[in-house]
Amino acid sequence: MGRINYMAFTIPENLHPDLMPLAWLVGSWRGKGRGEYPNVPGFQFAQEVSFNHDGRPFLNYFSRSWIIDENNEIIRPAASEVGFWRVKENNVLEVILAHNTGIAEGWVGIVSGAKIQLAMDQGYSSPSAKIVTAGSRLYGLVEGELFTSYDMAAEGQTLQAHLWSSLERQG
């Protein structure tokens, strides 16, 4: 049998039942975004994100990005993050992330259809990393594209918009 088609995405047959609320995320995504923050010039970035599974009740998550110029040419590597996403009772989502910048975070939120809202629950910064005190993330599937936004409070700033992107499913 193999795979079951569901709406605009395919559900792998061996996806753990707990992960069905996240089935629309499974796979690879690629696109572009923009970023800004106080004392940081605005920038554009290219991004690749993947959500994979091995039959257990969590998704493996990997994201990497590159700063790009106005011609979409890569200037340099930027942020990378890895983590695990798991759905608990009542579509509560728990996410653990680690960043190449020396930050690790725990996030808690809700999956509601093709929309995810997360709030940072706990954070850790290595001695040389910036201090992030709060964050919120939004993920949503709109007309087949994955839209993301990340609001951050860091280095004494209040919670405010930092990153947003639009990604297309690959393959």
Language-model region placement:
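Acidic, glycine-rich flexible loop segments
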Residues: 101-104, 111-136
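Helix-adjacent hinge/juxtasegments
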Residues: 68-108
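Amphipathic/hydrophobic helical signal segments and adjacent flexible N-terminal regions
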Residues: 2-58, 66-74, 143, 154-171
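Short connector loops at helix/strand junctions that flank enzyme active sites
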Residues: 44-46, 54-58, 78-82, 88-92, ...
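Residues that act as N-cap/strand-start positions at coil-to-secondary-structure junctions
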Residues: 43-45, 79, 103, 131-133, ...
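Short hydrophobic/aromatic-rich beta-strand segments that constitute the beta-sheet cores
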Residues: 31, 59-63, 93-97, 116-120, ...
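Hydrophobic/aromatic beta-strand elements that line small-molecule binding cavities or substrate pockets
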Residues: 46-52, 81-86, 106-110, 134-140, ...
